[in-house]
């Protein structure tokens, strides 16, 4: 991205912006300075990658991303301010590049929006796709609310959109690909149920697709683009009522899990696009709730996934469902009220979860032997 060029430039001038204390850590140099948020001398700067980290506030970002998040402004706006005010630079070239990148992003959003409309129209022409969705218990209203669609088997999207967009731009957006051998363009999503991935500002970032055919890949997503990074996106975040701060947000694995919960009125659920929960996901969630909660099956696979998430993230609440039941299946079988009661009775803090994993299996000695490991994860 163009903005990265200026972020690298800023790294060369950090000493002109902050008063650093130089410290050695593990064979490489770190710098310490006052935290932008809590003002204490607790913020570390890693000059090798330009990252600021504060263990008290829990962030790890470059200076532009950090300041733009604090001030709630666009990164380009914050970059221009830092360069102009702190480094006394002529920022006219920055503004030119900003306009170029913003225009490029707007083009990708428009392509994705038109693709979403196409997929929605194609769903109405596919009895098999409609039968699949209704067979999963989804109502017509839910299908419309989530803008679910269908990608036909052949290259119909390419033929439809190329009249309004350059093929190179369609490929950049990730809705079509190019065959390296023949140079021909093709639809990325074929014979798949389509799940548009929409941000909290109602912009279409990309798509997930679930096969209805014989593809070896059950689910695929849009490739990484300037506006879509799978490890940073949360499915259905736009459907969560963020006007008030939800007490809890449930984080599920699958698209259908999230949709099933919303259909039953559990409208504080999101999904991770089939990937493991990342630090980026976690930081996003903390903007909207104090209690992000991972929801997995109670079988061995679910427990292993929970362990990985806690080892990577740390302070998460945990809800393990009965074995062989995912959220979709559970709420269909037992209903909303039973699900809410199950949450109330079975939610665990990360401390409770780790303690139960050891002591619940009679491994009390292993629990005490692993105290240092657990403390490292939790704190």
Regions found by a protein language model. Name each.
Residues 76-128:
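Conserved active-site segments centered on acidic
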Residues 1-8, 55-58, 204-206, 213-226, ...:
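TOPRIM fold recognition
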Residues 108, 115, 150-153, 377-378:
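Active-site-proximal helix/loop microenvironment
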């Amino acid at each position: 991205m163009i903005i990265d060029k200026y972020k690298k430039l800023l790294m060369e001038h950090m000493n002109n912006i902050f008063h650093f204390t130089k410290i050695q850590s593990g064979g490489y140099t770190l710098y310490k300075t006052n935290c932008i948020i809590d003002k204490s001398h607790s913020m570390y700067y890693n000059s090798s990658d330009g990252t600021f980290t504060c263990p008290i506030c829990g962030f790890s970002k470059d200076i532009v991303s950090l300041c733009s998040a604090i001030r709630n402004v666009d990164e380009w706006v914050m970059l221009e301010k830092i360069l102009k005010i702190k480094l006394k630079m002529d920022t006219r070239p920055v503004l030119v590049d900003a306009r170029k990148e913003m225009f490029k992003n707007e083009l990708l959003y428009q392509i994705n929006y038109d693709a979403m409309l196409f997929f929605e129209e194609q769903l109405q022409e596919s009895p098999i796709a409609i039968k699949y969705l209704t067979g999963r218990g989804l109502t017509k209203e839910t299908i419309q609310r989530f803008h679910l669609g269908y990608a036909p088997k052949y290259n119909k999207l390419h033929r439809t959109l190329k009249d309004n967009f350059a093929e190179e731009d369609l490929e950049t957006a990730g809705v079509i690909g190019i065959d390296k051998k023949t140079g021909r363009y093709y639809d990325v999503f074929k014979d798949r149920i389509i799940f548009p991935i929409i941000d909290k500002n109602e912009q279409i970032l990309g798509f997930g697709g679930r096969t209805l055919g014989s593809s070896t890949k059950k689910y695929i997503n849009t490739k990484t683009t300037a506006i879509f990074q799978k490890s940073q996106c949360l499915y259905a975040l736009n459907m969560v009522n963020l006007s008030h701060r939800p007490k809890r947000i449930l984080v599920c694995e699958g698209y259908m899990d999230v949709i099933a919960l919303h259909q039953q009125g559990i409208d504080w659920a999101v999904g991770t696009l089939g990937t493991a929960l990342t630090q980026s996901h976690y930081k996003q969630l903390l903007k909207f709730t104090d209690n992000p909660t991972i929801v997995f099956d109670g079988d061995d696979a679910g427990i292993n996934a929970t362990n990985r998430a806690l080892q990577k993230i740390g302070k998460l609440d945990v809800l393990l469902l009965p074995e062989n039941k995912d959220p979709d299946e559970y709420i269909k079988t037992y209903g909303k009220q039973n699900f809410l009661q199950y949450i109330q009775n079975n939610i665990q803090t990360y401390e409770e979860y780790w303690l139960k994993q050891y002591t619940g299996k009679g491994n009390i000695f292993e629990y005490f032997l692993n105290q240092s490991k657990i403390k490292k994860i939790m704190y």
